[in-house]
Amino acid sequence: MAGYGVDGQRMMGVVGMDSRGMGYGGRPEPPLPPDASSTLYIEGLPANCTRREVSHIFRPFVGFREVRLVNKESRHPGGDPHVLCFVDFDNPAQATIALEALQGHVTDDVNVSAPAEEGILREKRAQCAQGFLPCKDNKCYCCIGGRTHDCYYTMAQCSHACF
């Protein structure tokens, strides 16, 4: 049927006066880097969060596909496990809209046993550690680890310059 995507959701866009695409809801689509990904990496989730809880946060966004959680053991003896979270969208523009809307979103403000940093979503575009990941002002200062990517916003915070 014309105007509908494979999954039955209506697919439409409008061109704005400056020829930029207008995304869903009439909002201009954000400018995207050429290597933009449709997958977001979420950090700051509590160790006991579930896939269902994270899905509940992202489900209202157009293009949401799925959440993948990976539990990793702590690098420190006796430390809490670390949760890696990846959220997939249909396209990079939809991922960017969710990223901008939820940056710094508080997920668990009652969990007193959680460290102060835990419970605040910090989102980044998921990308291979081989490449650079624009986090703040399109600058990435550090790649750490083989498959993970930690981003530091200033050179002073980074001890492993990767550029």
From Swiss-Prot:
It comes from the Eukaryota. Pfam families: Meg, RRM_1. The keyword Disulfide bond applies. Disulfide bonds join C140-C162, C143-C151. Keywords: Disulfide bond, RNA-binding. InterPro entries: Meg, Nucleotide-bd_a/b_plait_sf, RBD_domain_sf, RRM_dom. Residues 38-117 form the RRM domain. Ubiquitous. One of its GO terms (molecular function) is mRNA binding. SUPFAM superfamilies: RNA-binding domain, RBD. Belongs to the MEG family. This is Protein MATERNALLY EXPRESSED GENE 5. It comes from Zea mays (Maize). The lineage of its organism: Eukaryota, Viridiplantae, Streptophyta, Embryophyta, Tracheophyta.
